[in-house]
């Protein structure tokens, strides 16, 4: 059986509308992203060609969302017709960078669960660094994203000044 790996936020789930809910005043990432993750069940799906019923592969989902949001995440996947075989989520209060986190997920899939890496047809993610990591490990990978709004960098403070003439 062949496998594809899908990222969730901004790859198959359109999270752009909830990025404004990230509380950049919070130092703790769990608190910072709580409202953002809590609203994920209301996302619209995107890049549906990656998971529609014509996709002949088993779907494995790698997401940086904490396990605390596991039930609504699994429900969203099912409600949107994403027939996933496995869902990998970060441990609660684990703030590991996405690239390293997904590398660990891949190691667990291959070494821990005995999946032949040759069966992985492609891994899709919205982040260039994650896609490069997959490629360096011999996994075909492609960047697929729905939008270009970053959920990892606080928006810059723009100061507008008005000059009177």
Task: Label each PLM-derived region with a short phrase.
Residues 2-96:
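Alpha-helical substrate-recognition element adjacent to the catalytic core
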Residues 58, 81, 114, 138-140:
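Glycine-centered loop/turn motif at secondary-structure junctions
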Residues 3, 102-128, 134:
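Conserved Lys-Pro-Asp/Glu-containing loop-to-beta segment of HAD-superfamily phosphomonoesterases
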Residues 51-55, 110, 135:
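Surface-exposed amphipathic alpha-helices with a cationic face
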Residues 73-81, 109, 132-138:
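Short, aromatic/basic amphipathic alpha-helical patches
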